[in-house]
């Protein structure tokens, strides 16, 4: 049997994840049957589950990919870049984002599983804010955990607004965010 290149394997994995995102977005986790995944991805269940052992692993892979993407944006473009990126996300991305949030609410073990799969993501975010604080960019009269919660609340609210078709004034929102977190 010929050896398959790493590029081919990565392209096939990306194809599966993209099709899975569309399926989860359209039908939710429960409604994303294996048959629907096969139809949307254009591959057999054997091909799909050769890359991911089950539907749950496929869903978690999407969540981990999104978490990595968020961290890359946060590290390279900062909080402004992250919030701007949220306003540009596809409807399918937003639908999966909220499906994950719904599942986090009903399945507390999911957060532990996500942290176990990607322990460096939370640490990298904390380190970034610590660095910003040391550089005098983030206020020091409020604990970092509160700042993280604040930014997450803004990001989640912005994602919800965009997903229902609202177009918030992002520059005004960013000004409010910075009023709340920037060093005085």
Give the ranges of each region predicted by the language model.
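Basic, helix-initiating cap at the start of DNA-binding domains
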Residues: 1-27, 34-43, 56-57
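Amphipathic, non-transmembrane alpha-helical scaffold segments
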Residues: 9, 17, 63, 67, ...
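Key DNA-contact positions within bacterial/archaeal DNA-binding proteins
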Residues: 46
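Alpha-helical DNA-contacting segments of helix-turn-helix folds
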Residues: 52, 59-66
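Hydrophobic alpha-helical connector segments
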Residues: 61, 68-95, 144-151, 170
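Amphipathic alpha-helical segments used for helix-helix packing
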Residues: 88-115
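Hydrophobic/aromatic-rich alpha-helical bundle segments in the mid-to-C-terminal region
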Residues: 111-115, 119, 133-180, 184
């Amino acid at each position: 049997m010929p050896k398959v290149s790493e590029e081919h394997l990565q392209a096939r994995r990306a194809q599966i994840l993209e099709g899975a995102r569309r399926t989860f977005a359209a039908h939710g986790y429960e409604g994303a049957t294996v048959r629907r995944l096969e139809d949307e991805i254009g591959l057999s269940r054997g091909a799909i589950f050769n890359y991911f052992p089950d539907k749950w692993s496929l869903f978690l892979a999407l969540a981990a990919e999104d978490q990595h993407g968020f961290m890359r944006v946060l590290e390279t473009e900062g909080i402004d870049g992250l919030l701007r990126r949220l306003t540009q996300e596809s409807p399918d991305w937003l639908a999966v984002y909220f499906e994950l949030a719904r599942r986090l609410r009903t399945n507390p073990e999911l957060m532990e599983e996500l942290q176990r799969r990607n322990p460096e993501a939370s640490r990298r975010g904390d380190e970034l804010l610590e660095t910003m604080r040391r550089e005098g960019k983030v206020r020091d009269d409020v604990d970092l955990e509160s700042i993280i919660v604040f930014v997450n609340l803004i990001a989640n609210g912005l994602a919800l607004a965009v997903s229902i078709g609202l177009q918030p004034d992002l520059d005004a929102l960013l000004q409010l965010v910075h009023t709340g977190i920037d060093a005085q």
